[in-house]
Swiss-Prot record:
Binding site for Fe cation: H111, H115, D307
Lineage: Bacteria, Pseudomonadati, Pseudomonadota, Betaproteobacteria, Burkholderiales
Source species: Burkholderia thailandensis (strain ATCC 700388 / DSM 13276 / CCUG 48851 / CIP 106301 / E264)
Function statement: Required for the formation of a threonylcarbamoyl group on adenosine at position 37 (t(6)A37) in tRNAs that read codons beginning with adenine. Is involved in the transfer of the threonylcarbamoyl moiety of threonylcarbamoyl-AMP (TC-AMP) to the N6 group of A37, together with TsaE and TsaB. TsaD likely plays a direct catalytic role in this reaction.
Official protein name in the record: tRNA N6-adenosine threonylcarbamoyltransferase
Keyword line: Acyltransferase, Cytoplasm, Iron, Metal-binding, Transferase, tRNA processing
Enzyme Commission code(s) on record: 2.3.1.234
Length: 346
């Protein structure tokens, strides 16, 4: 089965071809980072308009790279939610228009399910069951994954997502957009232990997260620097130390909660997905913990940590292989800007 995947939930336009027998044949991605940078964040209307411009050229690119014709495609999977309503509508409209014109079925995919399953695209994918740590700009969750479509929420953020905390901290430090990579880069120049920030809910006894207090702690430290009239090299060093303190605190919480989830479920496999899953400090800490605690940790390829069409094509193919009745030829679609992943549990 050959599935075309279309991702357009936020500020990346991604298309891909996934074949159940041959794996990922091709994927193409356009990021809108340069366009949104001057505004300091994603502008939804601009994001939607750019998806319209980029989708069809990317389609031609993946068809050529995958050596496929439209006649070869068996189904079209698209991101149905969650995400920006306008951006989702663009992707859903294009998917259903192509499907109608080509006489193909469609299937709407949960964006986070795509992330959750994306490590299955690696050469040696993790077998079920496993614990999944989903960390992105909008979501931070721990899930028990028994099979495709069989998900149990173990814990989630009560306020800011980890990626959101990274982005807000970047703004407080006067860094550019996107903030997460900028904070991590600055943190590498900081001195470990120079600034120690709180680890919210580290000992809460559950698997939930909270990052708003950590962000507030960064704000408090920045106000102290302003009151001290720090400037020049002194201010640069202080910001690097503060960034290091923030990253260390966030990583400590993510690792500790992941270890607690593995202990609770008695599983030995951890899958990490989402944009924050590309963070070098988080990967290093989890790899070190895996060596000490005797569990396996799996990630998608770095290129597939961000939003992409490959994960949507994969999720569509896996669902259609298990539940062919989920294929639709109605073409009267809806999108779900808010959509709980646990609601997919069968």
């Amino acid at each position: 089965m050959l599935v075309l995947g279309i991702e357009s939930s936020c500020d990346e336009t991604g298309l891909a071809l996934y074949d159940t027998g041959r794996g990922l044949l091709a994927h193409a991605l356009h990021s809108q980072i340069a366009m949104h940078r001057e505004y300091g964040g994603v502008v939804p209307e601009l994001a939607s308009r750019d998806h319209i411009r980029r989708a069809l050229p990317l389609l031609e690119e993946v068809l050529a790279a995958g050596g496929a014709r439209r006649e070869d495609i068996d189904a079209i999977a698209f991101t149905q939610g969650p995400g920006l309503a306008g951006a989702l509508l663009v992707g859903a409209s294009i998917a259903n228009a192509l499907a109608f014109a080509w006489d193909k079925p469609t299937i709407g995919i949960h964006h986070l399910e795509g992330h959750l399953l994306s490590p299955l695209l690696v050469a040696e994918p993790p077998p079920f069951p496993f614990v999944a740590l989903l960390v992105s700009g909008g979501h931070t969750q721990l899930m028990r994954v028994t099979d495709v479509g069989v998900y149990e929420t173990l814990g989630e953020t009560l306020d800011d997502a980890a990626g959101e905390a990274f982005d807000k901290t970047a703004k407080l430090l006067g860094l550019g957009y996107p903030g997460g990579p900028e904070v991590s880069k600055l943190a590498e120049a900081g001195t470990p232990g120079a600034v120690v920030l709180p680890r919210p809910m580290l000992h809460s006894g559950d698997l939930d997260f909270s990052f708003s207090g950590l962000k507030t702690a960064v704000l408090t430290q920045m106000k102290k620097l302003e009151a001290a009239h720090a400037s020049g090299a002194e201010l640069d060093r202080a910001k690097a130390d503060l960034a290091r303190g923030f990253v260390d605190a966030a990583v400590d919480v993510l690792v500790a909660k992941s270890l607690a989830a593995l202990k609770k479920t008695r599983l030995k496999r951890l899958v990490v997905a989402g944009g924050v899953g590309a963070n070098r400090q988080l990967r290093a800490a989890l790899s070190a913990a895996a060596g000490k605690r005797g569990f396996d940790v799996h990630y998608p390829d770095l290129a597939l940590c961000t939003d992409n069409g490959a994960m949507i094509a994969l999720a569509g193919a896996l669902r259609l292989a298990r539940w062919p009745s989920q294929a639709s030829r109605d073409y009267a679609f809806t999108v779900k800007p808010r959509w709980d992943l646990a609601s997919l549990a069968r």
